Amino acid sequence: MRNYFTFIGLLFLFVFSSFSQENWELLKSVETGKILAWDVDPMSKVIYAKNDALIKLDTSFNVQFTQSVKGFGAVTKIDARHSLKTLIFSEDQQSVAFIDNTLTFHKGIKDLSLLNVSYATNVSYSAQSNRYWVFDDDNSKLLLVDENRRAPQVIENLQGTLGSLSLFQLLEMENVLLIFDRTLGIYLFDIYGSMIDFIETSEAKSIHFADGRLYYMTDDELVRINIKNRNVVRIPLPEKDLVSFRVLGRYIFFQTPTHIKKYFLKKVR
């Protein structure tokens, strides 16, 4: 009987592994070593921060541009959704800056303390390249900063609305603002600050949003949820020990402890 269950277990692992590989095609891979932050722009070009430099890869994963950030500080967030104007954030220095498509700094460095931010832990671009979100952890508030206006829009007392909050990832995509707490789940807000949904999960490691679908990654699966009808698709991951991911159409970019990889996701239900 023990041999029977061992056989069934091995058969399951074989089928799971085969199904995983059938869904994915590895297209590109680059060794990065340990990196601080990364993102992918709409042209499928990867930008990542390592040590005191920003590095941009072309679509063949060859180095296209590099830029020193010694004067800016350690980059802890890169948001490259606007291909001509990428946002970078340094938690240590409490500052944001913008770089163009050659990694050249654009209009200097923004000191977040000038916006009455006590301590920011995360930022996110908005749909418009002149606006971005800042999460002030000390005061549990969100600020929507508009470069064309003097004062930011402020959403106060998130702790009172959501309870105990440990924000891990902040992301605005397609007019949906996502607040990801690894211990509780994913909160979805509209751009005016009203909560519209909550996805409970304690297994998610990283999230993304594309084409009306919320994606989150666990140790073993990429989970895709249609926000309108709550249809859920679970896709076995192509490999183990993945750290984070980005979605660009049918292309999924993964960060491992030492590499960034680009996969093509074959059609799933």
Regions found by a protein language model. Give the residues of each.
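Bacterial Sec-dependent N-terminal signal peptides
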Residues: M1-L26
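A short beta-strand motif characteristic of beta-propeller blades
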Residues: E22-E31, N62-S68, F105-L114, R150-L162, ...
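Beta-strand-rich domains and repeat architectures in extracellular enzymes and scaffolds
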Residues: K28-D52
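Repeated scaffold domains used in trafficking and secretory/extracellular systems
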Residues: G33-V40, F72-A80, V117-S124, G163-E172, ...
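Conserved beta-strand positions in repeat-built beta-propeller and related beta-rich domains
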Residues: I47-N51, L87-D92, V134-D138, V176-T183, ...
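WD40 beta-propeller blade core
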Residues: I55-K56, S95-A97, K141-L143, I186-L188, ...
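Mid-chain, structured segments of secreted extracytoplasmic proteins
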Residues: V63-T104
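Blade-level signature of beta-propeller repeat domains, shared across WD40, Kelch, NHL, RCC1
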Residues: V243-R269
